[in-house]
UniProtKB/Swiss-Prot annotation:
This is tRNA (guanine-N(1)-)-methyltransferase. It is found in: Cytoplasm. NCBIfam families: PRK00026.1 (NF000648), trmD (TIGR00088). PANTHER family: TRNA (GUANINE-N(1)-)-METHYLTRANSFERASE. Keywords: Cytoplasm, Methyltransferase, S-adenosyl-L-methionine, Transferase, tRNA processing. GO terms for molecular function: tRNA (guanine(37)-N1)-methyltransferase activity. One of its GO terms (cellular component) is cytosol. Residues 230-241 have a biased composition (Polar residues). It catalyses: guanosine(37) in tRNA + S-adenosyl-L-methionine = N(1)-methylguanosine(37) in tRNA + S-adenosyl-L-homocysteine + H(+). Residues 211-241 are annotated as: Disordered. It comes from the Bacteria. Belongs to the RNA methyltransferase TrmD family. Its EC number is 2.1.1.228. It comes from Salinibacter ruber (strain DSM 13855 / M31).
């Protein structure tokens, strides 16, 4: 029985991707039919005897570029077997920034195909004619798109109903409501002179909720003020009325 979300990853380096999919939440999601995760070796879709998937860029320059033919064949074969994808995503530094809002939206789609670029990138015609969404993990360049693809898979699958043992866990993650997470503690209650805040041991659930909300707001204001409403603009607008 197929999972409620299917994600296919196309890569020239499948070994970088396959192993992490067999652990923790991603493994359990597959075993419980919540997710179907498939890795496709791009070289299997090359037709020359050397299984070449890259070539030198027109116009010169350093680096190699992934060829369009194998990428088109791979995506067309996947869609021929599993149906049309809701999104064909290329992982690239110049894509839209992956955030919790995007992960939430993607978790509601039924079928995603991820293209992990490598070398200098992929032929622009693949981006123009095949890709429907381009995603970045931030302003940093990695050797390839395999690690970003894994990050996207993990961020999305854990939001699919049934992926987590406690479904409320995903709802309390950082960024779900625009704030960073509160500090968390476990046993022992005292460690090297540092004690767990007494409110967390009080059993007063309302007080605990207030404490966590205060700490989340405090941390967000300190570390990521960009996530908070622009109170300065609000006050300026109010004073001008």
């Amino acid at each position: 029985m197929p999972g409620s979300i299917r994600i296919d990853i196309v890569t020239a380096l499948p070994a970088l991707v396959e192993e992490p999919l067999q652990h923790s939440i991603l493994q359990r999601a597959q075993e419980s039919d919540v997710a179907t995760l498939q890795v496709h070796n791009l070289r299997e879709y090359a037709t020359d005897k050397h299984r070449q998937v890259d070539d030198r860029p027109f116009g010169g320059g350093a680096g190699m570029v992934l060829k369009p033919e194998p990428l088109f064949r791979a995506v067309e074969a996947i869609e021929g077997a599993a149906g049309e994808a809701d999104d064909i995503i290329y992982l690239t530094p110049d894509g839209a920034r992956l955030d919790q809002s995007m992960a939430n939206r993607l978790s509601m789609e039924g079928h995603l195909i991820l293209i992990a670029g490598h070398y200098k990138g992929i032929d622009q015609r693949v981006r123009d004619l095949l890709v429907t969404r381009e995603v970045s993990i931030g302003d940093v360049v990695l050797s390839g798109g395999e690690l970003p693809a894994l990050m996207l898979v993990d961020a999305v699958v854990r939001l699919v109903p049934g992926a987590l043992g406690d479904s409320s866990s995903a709802l309390t993650d950082a960024f779900q409501d625009g704030l960073l997470g509160a500090p968390v503690y476990t046993r022992p209650a005292e460690f090297r002179g540092h004690e767990v805040p007494s409110v967390l041991r009080s059993g007063d659930h309302q007080a605990i909720a207030r404490w966590r909300d205060e700490k989340r707001l405090e941390k967000t204001r300190d570390r990521r003020p960009d996530l908070l409403p622009d109170t300065n603009n609000d006050s300026t607008e109010a004073s001008s009325q």
